[in-house]
């Protein structure tokens, strides 16, 4: 399997060829959302970071139900703007603190190469 690096320019290309088990094996969190923020996929690394089971979060809204601390202009605003413009590609640092110990992370948002979905990649800093 090809090594996927957090923040790599073509990460959306690599993700398109990966199955669920390979996505779970990533060394960083990977959350796939639809345009409204509904969670389509949530890998094991993200579950370990947040203490949430992937099975419990799929189908819920990321910004409203799972991580309301991200429903800010800095995070959710970037997501909505990128979706509206069709060119989501942002990388920034953030602190997750909803129902967990405050944790500084690096976030990389990218539009998926196929379909109408979007990836949020998360790595502890």
UniProtKB/Swiss-Prot annotation:
<comment type="similarity">
    <text>Belongs to the photoactive yellow protein family.</text>
</comment>
<dbReference type="InterPro" id="IPR013767">
    <property type="entry name" value="PAS_fold"/>
</dbReference>
<keyword id="KW-0600">Photoreceptor protein</keyword>
<protein>
    <recommendedName>
        <fullName>Photoactive yellow protein</fullName>
    </recommendedName>
</protein>
<comment type="function">
    <text>This photoactive protein is a photoreceptor with kinetics similar to that of rhodopsin.</text>
</comment>
<keyword id="KW-0716">Sensory transduction</keyword>
<keyword id="KW-0157">Chromophore</keyword>
<dbReference type="InterPro" id="IPR035965">
    <property type="entry name" value="PAS-like_dom_sf"/>
</dbReference>
<dbReference type="InterPro" id="IPR012130">
    <property type="entry name" value="PYP"/>
</dbReference>
<keyword id="KW-0675">Receptor</keyword>
<dbReference type="GO" id="GO:0006355">
    <property type="term" value="P:regulation of DNA-templated transcription"/>
</dbReference>
<dbReference type="GO" id="GO:0007602">
    <property type="term" value="P:phototransduction"/>
</dbReference>
<feature type="domain" description="PAS">
    <location>
        <begin position="23"/>
        <end position="86"/>
    </location>
</feature>
<feature type="modified residue" description="S-(4-hydroxycinnamyl)cysteine">
    <location>
        <position position="69"/>
    </location>
</feature>
<dbReference type="Pfam" id="PF00989">
    <property type="entry name" value="PAS"/>
</dbReference>
<dbReference type="GO" id="GO:0009881">
    <property type="term" value="F:photoreceptor activity"/>
</dbReference>
<dbReference type="InterPro" id="IPR000014">
    <property type="entry name" value="PAS"/>
</dbReference>
